[in-house]
Amino acid sequence: MATAVVGDDVYGEDPTVNLLEKRLASLLGKEEGVFFPSGTQSNLSAVMAHCGRGEEIIVGKNYHVYWDEASGASVLAGISLWPVETENDGSISPSTVEGAIKEDDPHHASSRLLCLENTVGGKAISLKKMQDVSETARKNNLSIHLDGARFFNAVTALRCKPEELANCADSVSICLSKGLGTPLGLSLIHI
């Protein structure tokens, strides 16, 4: 580490961070990646990129974004979270998404984002289920964010290519310390 070439990553001057961001984006078939020190920061940035104040996220009631991130989307960004039931494997069914969607109406928050997670509670959600719920979200003009803290665990369990799972979402948070053993860090990958 003492001999590593470093720079100010805020100004894009750290070649190691730049390479990491580009490598992860390429691996997932996405255009860009941004390094964050934590998953909460990465997920919050994604949520704020997809939603405006007064809009809403549809999210599994047991997902990290709803349960463990200190209501950051609501507190810092003015974005509502609409928690929905998940299946036994942690997935959200397409019919659950359709039932939760709110149209533009001045009386309530409009649904703008479906937040998914894979793995959930150590269970990898099948690629087919991820694709089906993503298709439903896209048909209903929802953006999709995947909290992939254990993304590579899911890819390994599903025996799929990283790009296949990443294609189920518009943005993906990938934790580098869970499953890969880095000291810290997350990368937000966006199309």
Locations of regions flagged by a protein language model:
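Conserved N-terminal alpha-helix of the aminotransferase class I/II PLP-enzyme fold
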Residues: M1-G39, K61-N62, Y66-W67, G72
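Conserved active-site segment immediately N-terminal to the catalytic lysine
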Residues: K161-S177
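Conserved PLP-anchoring active-site segment centered on the Schiff-base-forming lysine
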Residues: A49-W67
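Catalytic PLP-binding core of fold-type I/II PLP enzymes
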Residues: I125-T156
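PLP-dependent aminotransferase-class I/II
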Residues: G78-T119, A124-D132
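Glycine-rich loop at the start of a catalytic domain that most often binds anionic cofactors/ligands
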Residues: L27, A46-G54, G72
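Conserved small/polar residues in nucleotide/adenosyl-binding loops
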Residues: I189-I191
